[in-house]
């Protein structure tokens, strides 16, 4: 499949995979890509498959000359589902912001190398962490 930008989707998936353990190929559809990060374990006592994590997820949409994004902070539960929740622990929020910024920089640099822009979605108004200058 070729995206609106003219780039083959399979090649983009490979490039996105090289950015780190963020892309969830099974949740990517058409010109939309899904990334997430399990940044902080809520409680290490349960067995690994039963653990919950604080983290973030990002949806990326390919358009003709740019990719747009929207992201959310929240809880990745033991069933493997994301829920948007407020996080009140300063250290956790700082870690989420750090990992999101690190990923955003890598993603932006990759897209720039392909002559594509990375911008917030037009309807993404409540951006908790400012990522674009």
From Swiss-Prot:
GO cellular component: cytoplasm
GO biological process: positive regulation of DNA-templated transcription
Keyword Translocase (UniProt): no
Pfam families (alphabetical): Crl (PF07417)
Location of the protein in the cell: Cytoplasm
UniProt entry tagged with the keyword Manganese: no
Region (Essential for activity): 99-122
Membrane-spanning intervals of the chain: none
HAMAP family found in the cross-reference section: Crl
Protein family: Belongs to the Crl family.
Name under which the protein is recorded: Sigma factor-binding protein Crl
Source organism (scientific name): Salmonella schwarzengrund (strain CVM19633)
Highest classification ranks of the organism: Bacteria, Pseudomonadati, Pseudomonadota, Gammaproteobacteria, Enterobacterales
